[in-house]
Design a protein with these regions (language model features):
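NAD(P)-dependent short-chain dehydrogenase/reductase
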Residues: 141-146, 171, 175-238
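Conserved glycine-rich Rossmann-like NAD(P)H-binding loop of the short-chain dehydrogenase/reductase
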Residues: 27-40
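N-terminal Rossmann NAD(P)H-binding glycine-rich loop of SDR-like oxidoreductase domains
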Residues: 5-23
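Conserved Rossmann-fold NAD(P)-dependent oxidoreductase catalytic core, especially the SDR/UDP-sugar
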Residues: 88, 114-165
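Active-site segment of SDR-like NAD(P)-dependent oxidoreductases
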Residues: 92-94, 133-140, 194-197
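NAD(P)H-binding glycine-rich loop region in Rossmannoid oxidoreductase-like domains
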Residues: 61-107
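Glycine-rich NAD(P)-binding loop of the Rossmann-fold in SDR/ketoreductase-type enzymes
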Residues: 62, 99, 103-114, 160, ...
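Rossmann-fold cofactor-recognition segment
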Residues: 49-65
């Protein structure tokens, strides 16, 4: 079955790994990908730029004209494929915007919802929403394993910081996704990522590069709110 993938944030940590996995295993797949290089560079997908299965655009999820161009391209190509899958990897992480609650809203909430509506409008069969383990707040990990997907998330005991607003925004996108699926508009799911670290990260947007960069430039790391008492686990993309 031939599949057309439309991926936002395609040069980022998750997006570029998808490009490698899809194109190395599926000769019939095609990827339309875009990124504004918020926390990445073209180098992460450089080996596929001349591959006719990969169309890359330096576009911004929040730019209406650029997203209309993506939509038009999908509509022009859709009849050549058995299935269309949208994957939303674009996100502004909270590390450098810890105390500025509006900085992550436009991309993470509005942008995600607009991209979801585009997927529905073009008749895509599936939409995969990259959410975050931050929705678990301070309980994302503990000696007993932390919360489970089946547990209730109680916002009453959520910490009061940019991490909370970031997590709340991401949680809202999960409800957008669930609502669209329940109404039969599209098939899809939200994936709650743990703290992921990639060797391809060059910019201190995520927590581990932020720590490394702080040590190199300042010789110290400033621990933000609650960072002295919570524990985190990390997954590394090799």
């Amino acid at each position: 079955m031939s599949v057309l993938f439309v991926i936002s944030g395609v040069t980022g940590m998750t997006g570029n790994e998808l490009v490698h996995q899809i194109l190395s295993k599926d000769d019939d797949a095609r990827i339309i990908g875009f990124d504004n290089f918020y926390a990445s560079s073209i180098e992460t997908v450089e080996e596929y730029l001349d591959d006719n299965r990969f169309d890359f655009f330096e576009y911004d999820l929040n730019n209406e004209k650029e997203m209309d161009a993506i939509k038009s391209l999908v509509l022009d190509m859709k009849d050549d494929f058995d299935e269309i899958v949208y994957i939303n990897c674009a996100a502004v992480v909270h590390t450098e915007h810890f105390y500025n609650v509006y900085e992550t809203y436009q991309t993470n909430v509005v942008g995600m919802n607009d991209f979801l509506n585009q997927a529905i409008d073009v008749g895509a069969q599936k939409y995969i929403n990259c959410s975050t383990s931050e929705v678990y707040s301070m309980n994302s990990w503990n000696e007993h394993g932390g919360v489970k997907e089946s547990d209730y998330i109680t916002m009453a005991n959520a910490e009061h910081s940019q991490r909370t607003s970031y997590a709340t925004g991401k949680l809202l996108t999960e409800f957008f996704m669930k609502d669209a699926v329940n109404k039969g508009k599209i098939k899809g799911c939200s994936i709650r990522f743990a703290n992921v670290y990639s060797k391809d990260e060059k910019y201190p947007k995520h927590i581990i590069p932020h720590i490394i960069n702080s040590f190199k430039n300042d010789g110290e790391v400033t621990l933000l709110e609650n960072s002295k008492k919570n524990r985190r686990t990390f997954l590394q993309c090799l």
